[in-house]
């Protein structure tokens, strides 16, 4: 489902299929995931509604929480060892503090055998220990170090040179 959820979620509130789905090929190997979840910050509301409907998870009450707290709870409730997880810009829903919480949850789950594919611009989530980071530069995909990512470099530049940077950016 392009909006998110498990492989069993079949719903669509808006046709958002990407051409990327035509370029992906699933290859079965020795390891089979026992659980999987696709989570996007932008379609959280729809997935949370279906999660409550499909799973009958009344106790989660995702819609009674703030966007970030509900998103984090949905992620936490669906992380399991030996799972396969696709997260699309999860930082869009989370404060820096909650990004650290998600980082801890991902790290703990990965140590128990889960695999994660995370598309992110967050220097916090890029910092997950042991993560392989792939950068997309000039139409090429390559492994890169944490400190080589644009997200890290821009954040570092802002923190270390905020006044100079803002002066240059906002100068009329």
What is the predicted function of each stretch?
Residues 20, 24-26, 61, 73, ...:
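Conserved phosphate-binding elements of NTP-dependent enzyme cores
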Residues 36, 84-86, 115:
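Residue-level preference for the first positions of well-ordered beta-strands
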Residues 42, 120-122:
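A short beta-strand-to-loop transition that corresponds to the Sensor-1 phosphate-sensing loop
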Residues 65-87, 97-109:
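GG-anchored amphipathic helix commonly corresponding to the ABC/SMC/Rad50 NBD signature/C-loop
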Residues 88, 118-119:
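Conserved D-loop beta-strand region of ABC ATPase nucleotide-binding domains
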